[in-house]
Amino acid sequence: MRIAITTPTGNIGRELTKRLLDQRGTQLILLARTPDKLKKEQARGAKVVKADLGDAASVKKATQGADALFFLCPPSFAVPNYRAYYVGLAKNGAEAVKANKVKHTVLLSSVGAHLSKGTGPILGLYDAEKIFSKATQGLTILRPTWFMENHLWHLDEIKNMNSIFMPLSGNLKAPMIATVDVADRAARVITGPAPSRPTIVPLHGPKDYSLDECAKIIGRAIGKEVRHVQVPPAKAKEAMIGMGATENVADTMLEMYAAFQAGTLKDEAKRSPETTTPTTFETFVKNVLLPALKG
């Protein structure tokens, strides 16, 4: 089975690649802007193809001969319009799927992608789901919730100020998931049979966590108190632009945060044993966040 993977150096793509390289009967095609970053994977038998998801011809050529495709729209703070950026990538991917008759596509989407307004960058994934659904019936849509890895954006704040600054209240609770668990489910799905029509797979992590609770867990792990601090949206926007975000990206992120705060950005599916995944926030902190703090 020949499986093409986009963004193979990202958190999810990297873990998915590891899992599939360990499985017999899979041949991987890794689409990468910088193939040199994948020498280890190439040495293990993966075919590494230089490709740019923003170039339709490049994606089409790279996915020739693929039986399945894992498609992830990589986030970018530098784009002038976040939604248009996602739509462009999705169109390129969908055209490649249709042209190359890829039997099974696994699209990484997001919680809230069923909503047509008010969700900021997730609106681009709402569009992406529609675009791929028109291109193929063999589509599995993964809708994970809030990534635990989002806390990695706050490493400097944790190190230097023992705080995490966000435009959200500390008592806000949300399901959170580790990207390793998303990769686990993606590996299971993409090596299974293709669906006969577009199918949605919600992923809710182990439980709901409040942001105050996350700060306390991090504090216990590093041996000092860490606080969650709610900041005004204007301060959050200033910080994002300082990190390189365009004004449009910052505004769409604030729209998403506002939807989380209001409780309108939530999954239409209820938690179940099938949507619950094993990695706890404590395990994420131990295995991922602590090494990142020390690194």
Question: What are the functions of these language-model segments?
Answer:
Residues 1-41, 54-57, 64, 68, ...:
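Oxidoreductase cofactor-interface core, primarily capturing Rossmann-like NAD(P)-dependent enzymes
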Residues 234-295:
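A hydrophobic C-terminal alpha-helical subdomain
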Residues 85-90:
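Aromatic "clamp/platform" in nucleotide-sugar-dependent glycosyltransferases that forms part
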Residues 45-46:
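Glycine-enriched alpha-helix->loop->beta-strand junction motifs that scaffold or abut catalytic
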Residues 229-231:
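A generic structural motif
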Residues 179, 211, 233, 280-281:
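Structural motif detector for alpha-helix initiation sites
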Residues 51:
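Cofactor-binding loops of NAD(P)H-dependent oxidoreductases
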